[in-house]
Structure formats: C-alpha cells, structure tokens
C-alpha cells in the first residue's frame, strides 16, 4: 500500500482476493461474499441482488455519483485476469468449500533426504529453495472445480443443519452406503440419497503417485516390476514444478514405499523468447518444433538447444541456436565424406601422420575423461561443448589437416585405421546428443551386422592422457599460427615453402606436424635470428621467418616505419601515465604493474623494429 496513491486507504475483501483472505484470517476480519455461483450478486448486496457482476459494475458508479459519494475518478493501470478459454471473460476469485490435505507430516518425511544429500538436486541451488518451502509448508488444497479429472471420493449425506456437513470417504458408492449406514441416524439411508462431491482432484494429486502407480505399486505392492524399477535413478524436470511435482513425489515415495522415488533431480532451464518472456500458448511466442526440425534437422535443433542450456539456467531462444546445430551436423557430414573418400594403399606412414595419431589419441582420452566428469555432475551442456570443440577444432581443423595426404596421393593403412577408430569413438560420444546423424554415419563407417546399432556400442574406459604431449600440441598451434600470420602480413603464397628459425632450438616432439601445417621446408636452430626476418613469440620462445628474398623491401620499410611511429606514440602515452606520481600512488598495484608491462613490451617491440629497419636499409 502506498500512502500517496489513491485514497491512501487499504480496501480488504477477504472473500474475493487470495491475499486479502490471508490478511482477513490474520486479523479476524468478516468475510462477505457478494457473488452467487453463477456470478450474479448475492443477498450481501441488497440493492443489486441477482444482477450480473459486469452489469452491476456499470450501474454502481452512477449510483455513487447520485448519492454524492464520489470525490473524483482517476485512471490507473490494473492487472485483470482473463479466462484462458474465453479471452473476453474476466476471472474473479470466489470463496467456496475446498478439500485440504494436512502437509506437516509429509514435509517432515520429505525434508531429511534432500538436506542430507541422499537425494541430490542438479544444480544444487534448488536445494535451499526446496528446504525453505517445506519448512514453511501450508496445507494443500487438493480439490478443483473442473469437468474432467479424478473425482473427489467423498459422499455427502442429507442433513438439516446448514452449518454442518456430514460425509463419508469411500472407493465407490457401495462402500459409501455401507459406511453411511454405520453413522447414527442414517441406518436406513438409500444410495439415491448420497451426493457424490462434484469436484475433481488436483492434477498433481494424481501425479505425485507417478513413480509408484506406473508399476501398479499402489494396487499391487511388492510386484516384480515395482521391486525392480523403484527407486529409479534420475528425474529430469523444470524448476517451476519443484513444489507441484518433485516435492510431492518424494513425499508419496516415503509415505507409500518407505524410500525416495529417485536419487537425482536434474532441473532444465526455462525456454524464453528474445524478450525474456516464458514461452506460452497465450503469448503465441513459441516456434513450431516441427517447422524447426524441417528447417534445421532434428539433431540440429536438439544439439543447438543443448549447447545453450546449462543446468538450471534459462534459455533465451533464437533460431541462431538451431542454425549452429545444423552447421555442426554439416561439419560432421563433410568430415565423414572426406575420410571415406581417401584412397588407401600399403605405403609408409608419414612422420607427421604418426605424430598426429599419437597426439589425437591422448587428446581424445583427455576429452573423454572431461566428458565423463561432466556427465557425473549433470553438466550436460558443458559435456556437449567439450565434444563440439573436440570434433570441430581438434579433429577437423588440426588432426585431419595433419594426416590428409597430398592431392592425388593415397592414405597409408595405419593412419586410415586410426582415423576410422577415432571417428567411431567421436560418433559414440556424440550419440546421446545427436542420435540420428551418429547412427546413420556409424552404420556406414564400417561393415555392420543386421540389428547392430550405435545405441549398444560401449564407450571405453578413458586412459590417462599425456599432458606434456597435449602442451606440445598447444605450442604447435601457436607456432603454425605465427607462421600463417607472417604469410598473411607479407603476402607470401601458401605454396611457397619457408624456413623457420627457432632461437635456441626447437624442443617439441611434434616437429613434423609443424613443418607440414606451416608449409615449411625446414626448421633451423639458431642462436640469433636474422634481423630482416619476421619474428614472433610463443611463450618465452622466439621464432623468425626469413623473408628478405620474398618481399618488396621498400614497401616493408614503409610499413615498419608506420608501425614504429605508432608504437613510439603508444609508449609515450604509457610513460606519461607512469610519470604521474598520483596515478602510481593511488592506482591498484595490478593496474600499475600492467602499465609497466605495456612499457616493457613496447620498448622491446621498438628495438626489434629498429633492428629490422636497419637490416633492410643496408
């Protein structure tokens, strides 16, 4: 309530607003219900008895004006609920008799397993939400005024006391009649005098029995199926029904089976549109999944959404997600066609291929261990991202390029066999995320027996990866990238074989891969690089590519002079900042250290460029 809004007074209508009802109970306010069941005005409003609620609203204002009771009328925004099935009909809360289930007992039996991590939530942040809700549990209204549903199993007996209801709860009318005749005064009651409650049970009251009723565990307790399948391992659901369904299944599990219904609960994110709104039928903001599948493919849609769906985090949907999934599908198809298109011959395995096979085997084992760790912690999106990068970057961009034979040349059998084994393993790892393309390609990767499917193909135990070899390959990528940058900057054709100078020598077991992917003639170990060479650093190691005979010297001098002028200007700005005593004294230590590093880097770069210019001008 805001003291400066409207009258500054609070209107409380306990019979017509859920919040007001709670407030009325707290302060013992009178409950006045002005509506009849047919939405006409009740006898509580004598002037308008029998009038439709909407018509009544139209005449009340003129009546108040005529009585001189309106000081002024102001427009303001209000939230009015409308029927989902008839958008022109406003919905009004109304008091009526409801059935409730006492919940304290159920909360007491469902709290410990989550508190003690016997039943785990993924992500764990929902554990506190669950605990707080159960600790402040309210009784559950289990009746609904619906045409369809499981009917409330209550039968009312006739009575002259309007303040007191007499009823029995029974499985059917025969049982109800039997129970009713045991009540004093109703010994001769007939079945026709019983009135079956017209309300239906809340949908969730049926759903909370799902893990049990699915295997007939209520009517046939201890049967073979319920003993085998209960409790199950994992439940996948949305966080917005953690109270409606998850908590209540746990309650029912302990109540009827004496055990939790599952060991883990994985909460997916809520899919929202670009504006952050939850997708719903009423908003019409949900794309047609069949149209998405037709446009991007089933695996494309599935994989794109999985990549964007960290556990428990909402997804801001965009078609670009599915497009990314489709592009990845295309990448897999193209890699498959490339590999299956190679001609195989009994030729010697090139050294670059041998090194590439050795490296990728360890890279695959490293990724396999990471994926298994993500799966064990229910980080499915992270697992998908590891596989996405493994296939797109490591396998396609680096491994296949390292082993690809020269144009018109065959592939050696050892490398081809290893490549097919790697492809097989990649398809197995990707299968849970992309079932259709992986099944299709796996069937064509090798000869298969009838009925054989990738669904039954096992993922082997991971072997500890050689981290030193993986680090060596990381250096290879930087060295190859450095040489490619030199080619681009100096406009050197890809066909031209270059020499790479490694100052202090190259200590890398994957040297043959560098030579092949960088298009090198050789790698020379030198104590001092050629001053006219294009240099670059990989960590603390210095490399250089001699280019004197391959470039336009005058153009290179102009470019170096321009770069030198810019770097000197940059150094001057850094010096100015470091010469400011107030900056050095007051700025965070890390910021000052970063500026000093910029100064040192600029000075080193200037010295290198001056040296190169001097060599070019000779």
Where do the model's predicted regions map?
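Alpha-helical recognition segments enriched in aromatics with Gly/Pro capping
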Residues: 1-3, 27-39, 146-149, 153-159, ...
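Short amphipathic alpha-helical coiled-coil/interface segments
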Residues: 134, 329, 364, 368, ...
């Amino acid at each position: 309530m805001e003291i400066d809004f409207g009258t500054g007074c609070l209107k409380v209508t306990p019979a017509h607003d859920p919040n007001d009802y709670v407030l009325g109970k707290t302060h013992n306010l009178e409950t006045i219900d002005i509506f009849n069941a047919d939405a006409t005005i009740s006898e509580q409003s004598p002037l308008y008895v029998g009038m439709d609620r909407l018509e009544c609203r139209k005449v009340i204002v003129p009546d108040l004006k005529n009585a001189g009771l309106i000081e002024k009328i102001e427009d303001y925004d209000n939230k009015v609920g409308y029927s989902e099935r008839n958008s022109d009909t406003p919905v009004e809360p109304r008091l009526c008799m409801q059935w409730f289930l006492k919940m304290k007992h159920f909360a007491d039996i469902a709290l410990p397993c989550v508190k003690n991590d016997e039943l785990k939530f993924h992500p764990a942040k929902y554990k506190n939400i669950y605990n707080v809700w159960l600790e402040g549990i309210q009784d559950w209204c289990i009746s609904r005024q619906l045409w369809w549903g499981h009917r409330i199993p209550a039968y009312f007996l006739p009575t002259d006391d309007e303040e007191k209801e007499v009823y029995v709860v029974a499985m059917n009318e025969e049982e109800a009649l039997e129970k009713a005749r045991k009540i004093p005064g109703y010994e001769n009651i007939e079945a026709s005098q019983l009135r079956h409650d017209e309300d239906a049970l809340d949908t969730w009251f049926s759903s909370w029995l799902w893990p049990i009723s699915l295997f007939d565990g209520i009517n046939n307790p201890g049967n073979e199926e319920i003993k085998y399948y209960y409790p199950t391992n994992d439940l996948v659901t949305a966080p917005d029904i953690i109270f409606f369904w998850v908590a209540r299944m746990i309650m029912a599990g302990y109540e009827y089976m004496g055990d939790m219904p599952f060991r883990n609960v994985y909460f997916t994110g809520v899919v929202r549109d670009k504006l952050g709104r939850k997708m719903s039928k009423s908003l019409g903001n949900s794309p047609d999944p069949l149209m998405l599948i037709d446009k991007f493919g089933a695996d494309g849609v599935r994989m794109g959404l999985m990549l964007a769906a960290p556990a428990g985090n909402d997804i801001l949907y965009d078609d670009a997600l599915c497009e990314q999934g489709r592009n990845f599908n295309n990448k897999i198809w193209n890699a498959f066609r490339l590999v299956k298109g190679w001609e195989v011959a009994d030729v010697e395995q090139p050294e670059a291929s041998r090194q590439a096979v050795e490296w990728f085997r360890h890279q695959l084992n490293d990724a396999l261990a990471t994926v298994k760790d993500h799966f064990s912690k229910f980080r499915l999106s992270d697992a998908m991202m590891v596989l996405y990068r493994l296939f797109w970057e490591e396998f396609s961009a680096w491994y296949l390029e390292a082993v690809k034979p020269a144009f018109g040349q065959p592939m050696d059998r050892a490398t081809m066999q290893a490549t097919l084994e790697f492809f097989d393993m990649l398809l197995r790892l990707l299968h849970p995320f992309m079932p259709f393309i992986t099944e299709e390609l796996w069937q064509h990767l090798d000869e298969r027996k009838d009925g054989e499917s990738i669904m039954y193909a096992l993922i082997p135990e991971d072997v500890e990866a050689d981290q030193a070899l993986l680090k060596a390959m990381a250096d290879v990528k930087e060295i190859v990238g450095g040489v490619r940058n030199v080619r681009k900057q100096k406009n050197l054709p890809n066909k031209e074989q270059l020499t790479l100078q490694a100052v202090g020598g190259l200590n890398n077991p994957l040297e043959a891969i560098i030579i092949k992917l960088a298009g090198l003639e050789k790698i020379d170990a030198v104590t001092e690089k050629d001053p006219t060479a294009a240099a670059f650093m990989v960590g603390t190691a210095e490399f250089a590519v001699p280019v004197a005979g391959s470039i336009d010297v005058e153009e290179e001098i102009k470019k170096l002079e321009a770069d030198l002028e810019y770097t000197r200007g940059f150094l001057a700005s850094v010096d100015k900042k470091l010469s400011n005593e107030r900056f050095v004294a007051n700025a965070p230590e890390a910021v000052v250290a970063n500026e000093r590093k910029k100064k040192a880097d600029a000075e080193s770069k200037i010295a290198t460029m001056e040296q190169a210019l001097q060599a070019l001008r000779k």
